[in-house]
Amino acid sequence: VCRYCRLGMENLCDRPLFTGYTRDGGFATHTIADARYAFAIGGTGDDVSVAPLLCAGLIGWRSLVIAGNAERLGIYGFGAAGHIVAQIAAWQGRSVFAFTRTGDIAAQDFARQLGAVWAGASDQGPPDKLDAAIIYAPAGELVPLALRAVRKGGRVVCAGIHMSDIPSFPYSLLWEERQLLSVANLTRRDGIEFFKIVPQAGLHIRTRTFPLDKANDALAVLRAGQLLGAAVLQP
């Protein structure tokens, strides 16, 4: 057992196993899993609605926890994870500020429908300084923008698995004890806590389904920014 697993940080395990990545089963109707890492998801909805919760929802929840008790929360990239986290944050009584691609009026309207108090383009500044911001879009150029948007002592959380290179920026954006953090995977505790609050928060999961043999079409739609909510593949 590695040091991270002993410390309850199995999300940083030196020898991790991931279904669909290091282990087969990501698109299977049945798979074998270690029961210690399986979550009870009864009563959370139909299979299509639950699917985004098991990826975007879980990493979204961990990034929200890492963002801390931010009253004014910015979300950069209003996709699968963003639209779930926005609802949870609004349910918790936070003020959500949603940032989308420039000109994506549909996504901005969608964010307002889900409880955002403000929605605009990612290159716009929010009307008020943020306590924290979470970046879901894999665009490194958003990091300086998010740092500029948060108050002194605020946090910027990079929640993606990968991100394009972060451009250089003046130290003044990070100064005054702003924090820049990343998120990697999740722990069992994250999953247990998340699925406890899902029924309470009354989440509305927006999905668009694609047959498995149209997976490349789903990726193309995602890249083009033509999807509201989450894409779900059905075998």
PLM ranges: what are they?
Residues 159-163, 183-186, 210:
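Short strand-turn motif at the edge of the Rossmann-like AdoMet-binding core
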Residues 43-123:
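Mid-domain Rossmann-like dinucleotide-binding core that forms the NAD(H)/NADP(H) cofactor-binding site
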Residues 39, 74, 97, 155-157, ...:
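Structural detector of well-ordered beta-strand residues that form the stable sheet scaffold
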Residues 144, 188-235:
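C-terminal hydrophobic helical "lid"/dimerization subdomain
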Residues 77, 100, 137, 160, ...:
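Short beta-strand/turn micro-motifs composed of small residues
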Residues 1-76:
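NAD(P)H dinucleotide-binding glycine-rich loop of Rossmann-like/cofactor-binding domains
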